[in-house]
Amino acid sequence: MKKYKVGIIGYGGFGKFLHHWWEKLDNVEVIAIADSGKHPEQDFDIEKVYHDWHDLINDTEIDIVSIVTPPNLHAEMACAAMKAGKHVLLEKPAATTKEDALQILKTQEETGMIITVNHMIRYNPIIQKFVQLGQSGALGKLRQVVVNNYAQDEALAPDHWFWNEEMSGGILIEHGVHFFDIANALSGQKYTEVYGVSNRRNELQRDRVAAMVVYNEGLIANYYHAFSGPGFFEQTTISLAYDLARVEIEGWMPLKGKITAMVNEKIKGQLEEIPGWTITQNQELDSIRDNSRPEGWGDSDSSVTSKELTYFGGVGFEVDEMVSGTFELPETKGEVYGKCVQAILNDVIQKIENKDHKLAITLEDAYEALMIAVLSSENK
């Protein structure tokens, strides 16, 4: 088994996190870092420490370069690394502008090197299962996505690069791309219309943003991100409305959630494959009355169901039970996060070894999410 040698450009908190989890892999060795910060040399338990990233990408021992820098540097570094014969795992977003992203795509095509972007939430077991459910059509179409993301800003001083939109692209580009990508993966749909709004706390900090995205098969998605409070209030929910189900997922790195769905035996079997699935309620549809309208309004059941089908958006489904349940991963947030970054690096390695292997997140996928982020940022 070949051991792939990895170099990391950018050795802040996330660079260290990647190193911590990648060094646990038998087929990977992190041999070099490049960081422009002033760190005591003893901070680095690593073979090679560069203070100029050009030296790292020209290191002939390195197979894969991981780029973990402010987003405005991504395109230049990724293109240079590929031209130097290195495969690349690029931190999200792929870039901050359409032009830079297109340059990365062009360079990949010219060099033939493997590159993807670290949208590692695609490797989360909960998201993977709901992607599969979406592809199978088990729950009908995904009609609405609502993301509410309340993030802490305690570690983000007013002069942090995160607030500098020339460096980060702004919240929707630096952070929102994760959730645009999740909706793209869950639905398999393409955006057609994008709108954005925002609030500025002051001249330096645009701290609350929102976007609405309309997709080609009817999905409407709403995204809200606020970097404006203490860590105690940090919370992310992802709500999904399918024809046959209502789902609420908790955590920007999804860890648990709940679902209510109308099912038949086949669909119920597919729900059992969701990690940590536990049924909390199960009722025959024939025993449930539709109480969506108040008493005295009249019988509302006849317009929704027949003896054989239940209708959503004019489409009939053969279902006979209403099921509610919960799901939850057994690991901690850090463990789930760590396994996701291990999985994406192993995905890149599989692609290096087998060009026919399909990455779970492609450069084209990352470009699609970035374009939604760019458009929503321009329209705000």
What are these regions (language model features)?
Residues 1-3, 8, 64-66, 288-380:
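C-terminal helix-rich "cap/oligomerization" subdomain common to oxidoreductases
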Residues 18, 47-107, 340-343:
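Beta-loop-alpha module in the N-terminal Rossmann-like domain of NAD(P)-dependent dehydrogenases
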Residues 90-91, 115-117, 223, 249:
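Hydrophobic residues in well-ordered beta-strands that form the structural core
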Residues 103-120, 140-145:
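Rossmann-fold dehydrogenase core element
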Residues 174, 181-301, 345-351, 374-376:
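Contiguous beta-strand/loop segments that form the cofactor/metal-binding neighborhood of enzyme cores
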